[in-house]
Amino acid sequence: MSAMPDSAAELRLITFTVGPETFVLDIMGLRQIIPYTGSTTVPTAPAFIEGIIVLRNEVIPIIDLRARLYPQLQERPEQPLVLITHSSAGIIGIKVDAVRRIVNVSTDALLPPPPIIRGIRGELLIAIVPYEDEVYLLIDIENILSGDEKRALADADLTPPLRDSA
């Protein structure tokens, strides 16, 4: 999903918090949600990768969305979660503070972000989503990473170095 969706359709969105804001993401690419119990740091990984986890024999890079969007925030959530999702860069884990709920929203309700807000992180923000008494920020999973970061991830060797068994 890289642009505002066509009208008259309904989206299922998962709501989650990162720092002070509530974001939403289309659940179509969501594979599962798991508790964050830590990750393995890989020295050769690009800087935007917090670490890796192995889930069902698959190595999954973890991106800390809080660190990307709010690097100035020092406090950390007690029990962060990881959204395991499909992207053009492959399967990635997005570390978030908390997951709230799933909502159904008509695409007619989506509002384009004002031009001044688009500059915060380029095309990451797709739309503003008014829902009941709240306002959510719809983000594009494909734009969590820049083109250069996607290439770096594709080229990265995320296999942890083997330890000497001597």
Residue ranges and their predicted role:
Residues 1-166:
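An acidic, low-aromatic, low-complexity terminal/linker signal
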